Amino acid sequence: MPFLSRAQNATVSGSMRDSQNGETLIGANVQAPGLGKGNSSNEYGFYSLTLPEGNDSIELRFTYIGYQTKTLKVLPRGAVLLDIQLAPAGSLLEEVVIKANGLDEKRKSTEMSVSTISTRDVKALPALFGETDIIKILQLKPGITPGSEGTTGLFVRGGNNDQNLIVLDEAVVYNANHLFGFFSTFNSDAVKDLKVYKGGFPAQYGGRLSSVIDVRMKEGNNKKLSGTGGIGLISSRLTLEGPIQKDKSSFIISARRTYADIITEAVNKANEGDPEYNKIPRYFFYDLNTKVNFTLSPKDRLYLSGYFGRDVFTFKDPSFDFRFDWGNATGSARWNHVFGPTLFANTTFTYSDYRYKIANELQGFSFSLGSNVMDANTKVDFYWQPNNSHTVRFGGNITYHDFVTARLKAGSDDGRISFESGREYDGWEYGAFISDEWAFDRLKLNYGLRLSMWKNDPSFYANIEPRAAANYEVNDRLSLKASYARMNQYVHLLASSGLSLPTDIWYPSTEGVKPEISDQIAVGTSYLLGDQILITWEAWYKWMQNAVDFKDGAELFGNNELENELAIGRAYAYSPLELEIEKKDGRLTGWIGYTLAWVQRGDFPEIDNGAYFAPRHDTRHNLSVVALWDMHKWKKRGKDKSLQLTATFVYTSGYPAWLPSGRISLSDFPGAQPQFVVPVYGPRNTFRYPAYTRTDLGIVYKWKKRNGFENDLTLSLYNATDRRNPYFITIAVETETTPFGEIPFEIKAKQVSLFPILPSLTWNFKF
């Protein structure tokens, strides 16, 4: 076999990093142009390139979008350890002209149904209240449907919001929201890389049905002390990073906090003593990202990272004390080890905790409601690349889960009244995987298998999850792709509404609630137009078993038998057209995304006698346009300056809703005038909201001083056309004046809109 012929080959391997801060570069390219060989760095910055052994030097070229190309010669003898540092583009005035290496590599890859997000674009695009948000940018990608307006909910290819595996430095984030879903937990200043898989899932991922959102934090500048920050309308943030020991270890700490509570507190104090003044509730959120890393040896590196975030809502008066807080805590310890030029390993220990608590104290009486989920995970991944055409990945993980579902406590101060309910569950989740990628001339194959198991006494489940993907290069511009993936999900989110609320409950698989299973098939094409535009078309079909929904009239809180409130059925979704046109280079960059899709759920015996219905996230047409234009660059008084215009446009078909189809008038006794009007509900979700349309505009003015201090002012207009989009529809009963008094006579649906045109101004800085 060719990959066993080690005597005739040499291997060049090492890491690729940013020369200014030491950050590893993910997906950077290494090529031997004279031999037609090449490869790229993995998610940990490690690369390996096999070359024919000889006595003549071979030229290697290292490239990465946004960085200067580096060329050098090596003597291909045995194992060559070569760590590379690439210099980023320097001045704001520099025109970085790079061939579309990234787009062409994406076209050639077996990966499909994958999107990556640039943090540079995230910070430039207009945003709600000026708060840049990587999750909201994901909503602009095809195949991803947003939740309600302004929220960070993600419904990927017909899946529910709980079917997204969101990981931060490999630790699971169970609730990625602040402010009831209007902002995400991710501070873009602390994020280095974000990648989302919508299908064709690699075998190393498991545990959710619809997507994997892999977020990786920056590692910290190991060259010098530096910082970034910003001041906006509702929050400020600051990030500091620097070396602990230059070139050997570094740290990063990033903090963000809102300050509306400081203003409301001042207003409340100013109106103390006014009997007609109603106090304003106090609300704020904050989050903190930290990370340190140490180069222990040329072959070993240790990373320690953590995240802590919390939302706090309080309201106090002399007889009433209400507090509602929720948040996440995660921790990761990761060890990278290079066994040799072709074998790399990553060992990770992670901890995740999400909890919420509502506490209310009245005179002589107290009430609290809370829930939490905790994970402790151990994972080992191996990356073996015997030659440039063959890559093997294998590994496994063990996760311990602990769930506390809706713990309710109530009681009086004198002890006469006391009530407590809620249950605690635990479970063990196991996974093992292997995948193999081969390249044969124009054909690349990636196939693998994942074994997942769940143990929760007395239930036990074991499932085999096959994965496969293929890429055939028709020519130097066109590739044909196909993929298949089976996924299992052993934890379920019991959500009482279409919103992503902090009071939603995570619930494990049991004997009565089986794991959800999905199968997805996708086919597509990737075409490189010119050297800067990639056109991607995909069609997909996904079917799901053991889908979880609520029975009509389900009760969640204070219920120790939640399984009795659940209905189990099926779901399917499909799209003949998921299109993306993206341009990453030049003065004008951005993308256009469009999805035509159908989603159906059914076979629930307790819901509409098993009939299929459209869930809330079934939107037929989804169109997004994102544009960033580097309008002008100039130099004045020793300062590099630039002006950038940005815009986004979104169109989404109306989503389904369950509204009354009729009414019944009731009276106190036969023959009397009606005193009550009761709405009558028919089959689920037969009504559709009006279409959602929004245009956002932004302008970014940047200037860089001679001392390297960078500034930018970002002016955003959210909903620039002031369109009143529906947030929800409320049902109102209208009355009629009669000799007998006011009597109800008609039920009307009224649209409630949330956001008009909203301007914002944010100052960002970097030093």
Give residue spans per PLM region.
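Transmembrane beta-barrel wall of Gram-negative outer-membrane proteins
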Residues: 232-257, 274-312, 323-347, 386-392
